[in-house]
């Protein structure tokens, strides 16, 4: 992404220093971000998890737990950008997915996940959004704040299992 940011001349580029550990690519590195498409990291069915930004790793851990406990692979997506939706991907996933899960480290209300939820607003899809509730946080323990907002793989898995039961009815 850094190479792309240095080479492209069409738009301004914002480069942010990672707040957590650097995630190294496991495969070929994407060289163009002109086409704002999300990256499907794992292909599965029934459940699609979108881990935006620093919460991609949490999405990966959640997908691992689901694979072990449910016995099938779920789809894991790295959205790569928060300024819009990859509607082509969403339409393709809607064919064989019933539950869409969004994880973001920003404010839940009015965030990227709620934009995705509104995309499926008139459908039979279930969307679970996770982020930080709107509030003023002066001093806080990060782990406690994440727990209070159900931003832990085990809690997310419990919510997904409940959504699966609702889908079955």
Indicate where each model-derived feature is located.
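Thiamine diphosphate
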Residues: 7-169
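Internal gly/pro-rich beta-alpha loop/helix module
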Residues: 1-7
């Amino acid at each position: 992404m850094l190479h792309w940011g240095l080479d492209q001349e069409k738009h301004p580029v914002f480069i942010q220093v990672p707040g957590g550990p650097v995630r190294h690519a496991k495969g070929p590195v994407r060289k163009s971000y002109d086409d704002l498409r999300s990256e499907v990291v794992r292909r599965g069915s029934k459940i699609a998890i979108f881990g935006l930004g620093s919460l991609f790793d949490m999405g990966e851990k959640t997908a691992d737990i689901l694979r072990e406990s449910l016995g099938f692979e779920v789809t894991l997506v790295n959205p790569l950008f928060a300024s819009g939706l990859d509607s082509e991907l969403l339409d393709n996933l809607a064919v064989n997915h019933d539950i869409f899960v969004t994880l973001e480290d920003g404010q839940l209300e009015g965030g990227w996940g709620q934009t995705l939820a509104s995309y499926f607003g008139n459908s039979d899809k279930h969307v679970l959004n996770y982020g930080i509730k709107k509030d003023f946080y002066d001093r806080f323990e990060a782990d406690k704040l994440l727990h209070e907002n159900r931003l832990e793989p085990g809690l997310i898995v419990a919510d997904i299992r409940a959504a699966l039961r609702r889908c079955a009815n």
